[in-house]
Amino acid sequence: MALLQISEPGLSAAPHQRRLAAGIDLGTTNSLVATVRSGQAETLPDHQGRYLLPSVVNYHASGLTVGYEARLNAAQDPVNTISSVKRMMGRSLADIQTRYPHLPYQLQASENGLPMIQTAGGLLNPVRVSADILKALAARATEALAGDLDGVVITVPAYFDDAQRQGTKDAARLAGLHVLRLLNEPTAAAIAYGLDSGQEGVIAVYDLGGGTFDISILRLSRGVFEVLATGGDSALGGDDFDHLLADYLREQAGLSDRSDNRLQRELLDAAIAAKIALSDADVAHVEVGGWQGDITRSQFNDLIAPLVKRTLMACRRALKDAGVEAQEVLEVVMVGGSTRVPLVRERVGEFFGRTPLTSIDPDKVVAIGAAIQADILVGNKPDSELLLLDVIPLSLGLETMGGLVEKVIPRNTTIPVARAQEFTTFKDGQTAMSIHVMQGERELVQDCRSLARFALRGIPALPAGGAHIRVTFQVDADGLLSVTAMEKSTGVEASIQVKPSYGLTDGEIANMIKDSMSYAEQDIQARMLAEQKVEAARVLESLESALAADAALLSAAERQVIDAAAEQVRAAAAGEDADAIKEAIKNIDTQTQEFAARRMDQSVRAALKGQSVDEV
């Protein structure tokens, strides 16, 4: 069945013309850039054949250096050598100083409290530093592709908030890049393995990088990834493996001088080399500080086992947050260079009860997924006749009581996307609910565009507000919409794939957005009035039900007062004054409090009738 395409105005793809796009993994420790050539995604190396670019920038009087050269300056020029800047993105200075108290940089606050780093190149913010890393990656891609990039997809952690995501976009703009989309890192890894086509279910992405560990639980449905839960440890990564092994080697070699920075660097380099060797061999030979000896994989495993256990504890918490069991996970994707360690792969496999996916280089997998997505978004996908969109041009939502529109997915949300919201019944014994899908920016149904209607039947007959209906909106990478409604206690479900409809023109979309701004104040007032009328109807219906059941609890005088208050609500609700309705509701609430208390006492006595104190 064809679906409704929700198009972004002003965009058009030219399938016959190949456009240059790249995927960028802007990492905490290292960054990469990848592209699709001849139908295959590949990471792009520098002139020395190195794919990784250390996420390090050194600023000096005559300019700056990025990557390996910058990292070499870290020991002798720590103040001007900025690394792990991703940790600072979108955070206030106070937050950074609390989280990372031992940073060697000279930090000060900007006027709005954001961090500024004092360097030989001047006062710089994290966005500018990130932009310099992105420029280096873009230059690599431009040279390899012999042309300027038409667009990039940049990956970000799934837990990045709006400020951190906006900071990443700002950095790209400073670097002169057109961002097609920010893509969640776990989603990019899943795309690299082709998990976005043909499968549905739960996927875990285990990402153990140099300085951080992230676990993401995703649900894939009809090509849309929904992030169910994220977790991890921002202070745990492969670097910790290296330091543990370096300390072990120091002890074995009898090297007690910890003030010798050169020796510390030598120990760390030896530890890294041994760790890499032990991924393929059972024994690694080490020479450091005039000492030489062997370390076995078993010894290394004993050292790092507690750290690996910590990652699995985070996995367990994430699964609990997602509400799924380990055995429900269809695939486990491994990301990050530290997942090459055999013990990590073994323990993760045991935890999830399946062999993790490791066929793609874990350092490259996120960049490769981003490149695949960039190639699609820029219009190079050969088998796609549909425009692939960056954002939803107009908000999507549902009609609620009173002719109001409840927005579920706001305009300008990047796609693909899945969002869910819970609704409840309005009347006692309600067993069906009409779902009316809307598109637009206004507050009232009459001012928005109707997309579809369907009904959810089989809702349990409960008091008003007793049933909980979860409505999920999904927009896939082609901008196509489907809506599902499910009653949570029974699992009864209904859905709709929105049928083809005449699309809106660019002018119509622009007018809808313009109207939402022009009529904003009027719309808010209309919404407040409608909400108060809905609340008045709910209060009167509840009161009518209570009086029908328990009017005997009231004296004639009390009943008269309540009836008068109810009439006041009816009269106010018939008018157009939201404040008057609100006051009438407040008054009837006051007048019925004693009645509500008596009904509660009666219910408690009935529930306890015939029971002893011990039974209670």
Swiss-Prot record:
Keywords: ATP-binding, Chaperone, Nucleotide-binding. It comes from the Bacteria. One of its GO terms (molecular function) is ATP binding. InterPro entries: ATPase_NBD, Heat_shock_70_CS, HscA_NBD, HSP70_C_sf, HSP70_peptide-bd_sf, Hsp_70_fam, ISC_FeS_clus_asmbl_HscA. GO terms for biological process: iron-sulfur cluster assembly. Chaperone involved in the maturation of iron-sulfur cluster-containing proteins. Has a low intrinsic ATPase activity which is markedly stimulated by HscB. Involved in the maturation of IscU. PANTHER family: HEAT SHOCK PROTEIN 70KDA. Belongs to the heat shock protein 70 family. This is Chaperone protein HscA. It comes from Klebsiella pneumoniae (strain 342). The lineage of its organism: Bacteria, Pseudomonadati, Pseudomonadota, Gammaproteobacteria, Enterobacterales.
